[in-house]
């Protein structure tokens, strides 16, 4: 960990996502095939299983540079890694907190991965009191429960996830 103007920064491996976004308190699984992403997973597994996931600006970019990535992403905990045929890996992660990358550090050698110095961001709601926010969450849960009664193919896991919001 380093400090920049009083802000605590963590240095984490970066895994750029294409066509997918991870959020805090969300469990996501995805397949990884690019070497830079595999190296980021390996680096994270050696250092607390924590990784910074951020989206690429362009899906077609195969080897993203720091300028190809969004600065806001999610710090995630790696829960499971499965090796698949064809040198692909399926990863299960849990989003922990939103984060801002102050500095991306490109891989220096082919066997390295990209890193980022990230600052954890606080959860906040613009102009809404805590009481109002709780009321909005309750209303959303009630509406979702009503929807779930009519949805024929809704997984029980979705209802369990809703209950924990």
Task: Tell me the role of every PLM-derived stretch.
Residues 1-162:
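N-terminal low-complexity, acidic/polar interaction/targeting segments
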């Amino acid at each position: 960990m380093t400090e920049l103007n009083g802000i605590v920064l963590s240095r984490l491996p970066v895994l750029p996502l294409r066509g997918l976004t991870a959020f805090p308190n969300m469990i996501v699984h995805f397949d990884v095939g690019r070497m830079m992403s595999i190296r980021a997973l390996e680096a994270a597994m050696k250092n607390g299983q924590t990784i910074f996931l951020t989206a690429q600006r362009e899906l077609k970019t195969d080897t993203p540079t720091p300028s190809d990535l969004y600065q806001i992403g999610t710090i995630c905990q790696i829960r499971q890694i499965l090796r698949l045929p064809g040198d692909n890996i399926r990863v299960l992660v849990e989003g922990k907190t939103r984060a801002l990358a102050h500095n991306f550090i490109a891989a220096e050698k082919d066997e390295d991965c990209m890193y980022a110095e990230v600052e954890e961001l606080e959860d906040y709601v613009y102009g809404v009191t805590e009481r109002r926010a709780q009321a909005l969450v309750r209303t959303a849960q009630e509406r979702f429960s009503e929807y779930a009664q009519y949805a024929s193919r809704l997984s029980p896991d979705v209802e369990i996830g809703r209950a924990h919001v």
